[in-house]
A protein has these predicted regions:
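Histidine-centered active-site/metal-ligand motif
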Residues: 49-50
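C-terminal, non-catalytic tails of nucleotide-sugar-dependent glycosyltransferases
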Residues: 2, 39-40, 54-125
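A short, conserved alpha-helix in the catalytic core of glycosyltransferases
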Residues: 1-12, 17-46
Length: 125
């Protein structure tokens, strides 16, 4: 992520509740979305060195369930957020400012499904 420091400070950077494990990237994007950021640039030609959780693999650290954490925090899972808010993984979707998602029947039913999952996990917590 390449984010201006003022914006990073405004949204609070990565949330500790998603560390260690997964979910910190979609959480940061959701916090940016909630702060009215609508321009997300994807760069297709770059090198990334990812060491595949080398720290957590060597120790007895219990990983979080990022999908569950995200669901409990925002009321829907990261897949739903990526699909309807960030318009999926297609780089051609990122040519202009993103707009609020348009509610379709499919989106509505997926949102209802997410809400059932949310209440299920809330009851179990």
């Amino acid at each position: 992520h390449l984010i201006h420091k003022q914006l990073w400070d405004k949204v609070g950077g990565f949330s500790e509740e998603f560390n260690p494990g997964d979910g910190s990237d979609p959480d940061l994007c959701m916090k940016l979305w909630n702060s009215n950021v609508r321009v997300f640039k994807c760069i297709s030609q770059f090198k990334v060195y990812h060491f595949n959780s080398i720290t957590t693999r060597k120790s007895n650290i219990k990983l979080n369930n990022g999908t569950r954490q995200f669901l409990l925090k925002y009321g829907f899972n990261p897949r739903f957020f990526r699909k309807y808010y960030l318009k999926g993984n297609n780089l051609s979707n990122y040519i202009d400012k993103l707009k609020e998602p348009k509610i379709s029947m499919i989106m509505f039913f997926e949102l209802i499904t997410n809400k059932f999952k949310y209440f299920y996990h809330k009851i179990l917590s």
